Regions:
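Transmembrane alpha-helical segments in multi-pass inner-membrane proteins
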Residues: 203-259
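Hydrophobic alpha-helical transmembrane segments
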Residues: 21-25, 70-75, 97-101, 145-150, ...
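Helix-loop-helix "hairpin" substructures at the membrane interface of multi-pass membrane proteins
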Residues: 140-217
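Short loop segments and helix-boundary regions at transmembrane helix junctions
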Residues: 36-121, 221-233, 250-254, 277-278
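Membrane-interfacial amphipathic/re-entrant helices at transmembrane-helix boundaries
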Residues: 1-29
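Cytosolic-side transmembrane-helix boundaries in multi-pass membrane proteins
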Residues: 255-284
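Alpha-helical transmembrane segments in multi-pass membrane proteins
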Residues: 23-31, 57, 61, 72-84, ...
Length: 284
């Protein structure tokens, strides 16, 4: 145990470790706040669809040889979120079909562009890094950290300011519309915020693993709590804890950060399932 603490203290002296912890905590917090809403609205796969769009956008940025890819990826992903929401409201194209169409199309086009126009000598490594997250946390620059901090503050502020509206739209959209609430506008707001979170999370966990940050904390919290507020708070705490534990474990074991965080979240979900079963039996 002493050796582990000494090793962690040694790594803590390096800025890239602090950057990874800051970004990991912020992304985990933001994704968990919106995760409860997405799960309850059965929009869980919108995160998966938009993450594939972000991969395609990353490929376009690489083809255009743009150094700072995040602004372009952010714009394309947000526009796709709007398109996805509008297409899902089409009676001829259902929501799940729209997600599958945009998701698979973006992934295929992105990989095709990277194969045709890539000048990298390690294409498979670049693709793997984009899909599953960087194998090294050295890739986070101070600019990316500050951008993540700014966008995370914006996401949390939006969630707090529109908490009651999001709550109403999440539980009973029909009633919210009948009460005069602009439900479509708040659905759009949720989709845009999710798009922002996905772009921020790509460097840490990759485009294919982002959905885990959204789904697992929410499902784990729902096993133990019933009210929307309690579930949201529990999901946020669990998500941040799993992110911290996953990053520290990846440092000690030398494993990919994203995969390690998701593995910890799977373990937390298993424990919460058991806890929920025990608590449910006691209540009966």
């Amino acid at each position: 145990m002493t050796a582990i603490l000494e090793k962690l203290a040694l790594y803590w002296a390096y800025p890239f470790v602090r950057y990874a912890l800051i970004v990991g905590v912020l992304i985990a917090l933001c994704s968990s706040l919106l995760g409860v809403t997405l799960v309850l609205k059965r929009f869980s796969f919108i995160g998966d669809g938009l993450s594939h769009v972000a991969f395609g956008a990353m490929a376009i940025a690489a083809v255009l040889q743009i150094t700072n890819k995040m602004p372009l990826v952010m714009i394309i992903t947000i526009l796709s979120a709007v398109l996805l929401l509008r297409t899902g409201q089409n009676t001829k194209i259902k929501g799940d079909a729209a997600i599958a169409m945009i998701s698979v199309g973006s992934l295929a086009i992105g990989y095709l562009l990277m194969n045709i126009f890539s000048t990298s000598s390690n294409l498979s490594g670049d693709v793997c890094s984009t899909l599953f997250g960087s194998t090294s946390i050295l890739t986070l620059s101070p600019v990316e950290v500050w951008l993540c901090v700014g966008m995370s503050v914006l996401v949390v502020a939006v969630f707090i300011l529109f908490y009651n509206k999001i709550f109403a739209v999440t539980f009973d959209e029909s009633f919210a519309r009948a009460a005069g609430m602009r439900a479509g506008l708040y659905n759009l707001l949720i989709a845009v915020v999710v798009a922002v979170i996905i772009v921020l999370a790509m460097n840490l966990v990759g485009s294919l693993l982002i959905s885990a940050l959204v789904i697992f904390p929410a499902l784990s919290a729902m096993r133990m709590f019933k009210s929307f507020r309690s579930v949201t708070i529990c999901a946020a705490v669990l998500s941040v804890f799993c992110a911290l534990l996953g990053i520290l474990a990846s440092i000690l074991a030398g494993t990919p950060v994203g995969s390690t965080i998701v593995a910890v979240q799977i373990g937390a979900f298993g424990l919460s399932w058991l806890a929920g079963t025990v608590l449910g039996g006691v209540r009966r």
